[in-house]
């Protein structure tokens, strides 16, 4: 089978300016890949709800989706192939460390929440993604959490979080870092999807730190310039 063609969303399929445009040339390229028999896949740090608000699911006949940096995998029709969730204690430790540093954390779960009032880092990230900010709520320690985002200064290394058990911290290009389950990545999600699609290799396109693992395991990888 031909390799899967795997695409990040923000900064790759679409821009990260105020317009958040998907160019006609991108849509045409996806169509031509599909017509040539390549499985086409979205691989994003966005949760499914956030992704669906972009409308990108409608620009091509996608074969599958990898959401939350590999923590949710679905087929092209949205049927769940696999889902990974944080251990509750890992979520609690992350929030406690963020509270010590007066940083906000978004929890992506059934209902997205944020742990403190949005600050300049949250608002800058919201502009970058054109995304929604959840209500301020305290985590109850019970709900399953699919993904976390920590908000901090642009270019910060998030060192205080790097030794926390059970998580992997991936600083982004704006004022945020994605937090994933340790050992789970876009690469592992693509490999899980590939078992269903019957393909064991892929080509990928991405632009940020959460794309590095995906690029390491690809047959070929293309890093976008922003």
Language-model region placement:
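Conserved Rossmann-like nucleotide-cofactor binding loop
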Residues: 12, 48, 210
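Conserved acidic, metal-coordinating active-site core of Asp-based
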Residues: 101-217, 226
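Active-site phosphate-binding/coordination module
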Residues: 23-121
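Asp-based phosphoryl-transfer active-site loop
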Residues: 3-19, 215
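Short, structured coil segments at secondary-structure junctions
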Residues: 58-61, 69, 163-166, 217-218
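Short, well-ordered beta-strand core segments
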Residues: 65, 202, 221-223
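Short beta->alpha connector loops at strand-helix junctions that form conserved
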Residues: 17, 84-85, 225-226
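Residue-level marker for buried hydrophobic side chains located in beta-strands
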Residues: 5-7, 65-66, 204
């Amino acid at each position: 089978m031909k390799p899967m063609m795997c695409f990040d969303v923000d900064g790759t399929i679409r821009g990260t300016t105020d317009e958040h445009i998907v160019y006609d040339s991108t849509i045409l390229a996806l169509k031509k890949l599909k017509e040539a028999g390549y499985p086409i896949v979205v691989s994003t740090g966005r949760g499914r709800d956030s992704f669906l608000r972009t409308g990108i699911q409608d620009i091509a006949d996608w074969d599958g989706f990898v959401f939350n940096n590999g923590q949710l995998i679905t087929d092209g029709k949205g049927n769940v192939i696999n889902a990974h969730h944080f251990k509750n204690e890992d979520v609690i430790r992350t929030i406690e460390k963020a509270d010590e540093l007066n940083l906000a954390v978004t929890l992506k779960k059934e209902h997205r929440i944020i742990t403190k009032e949005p600050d300049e880092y949250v608002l800058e990230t919201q502009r970058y993604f054109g995304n929604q900010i959840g209500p301020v709520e305290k985590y109850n320690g019970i709900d399953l959490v699919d993904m976390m985002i920590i908000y901090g200064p642009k270019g910060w290394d998030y060192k205080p979080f790097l030794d926390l058990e059970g998580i992997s911290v991936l600083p982004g290009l704006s004022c945020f870092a994605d937090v994933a389950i340790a050992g789970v990545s876009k690469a592992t999600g693509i490999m899980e999807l590939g078992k269903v699609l019957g393909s064991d290799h892929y080509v990928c396109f991405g632009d940020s730190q959460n794309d590095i693992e995906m690029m390491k395991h690809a047959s070929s990888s293309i890093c976008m310039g922003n």
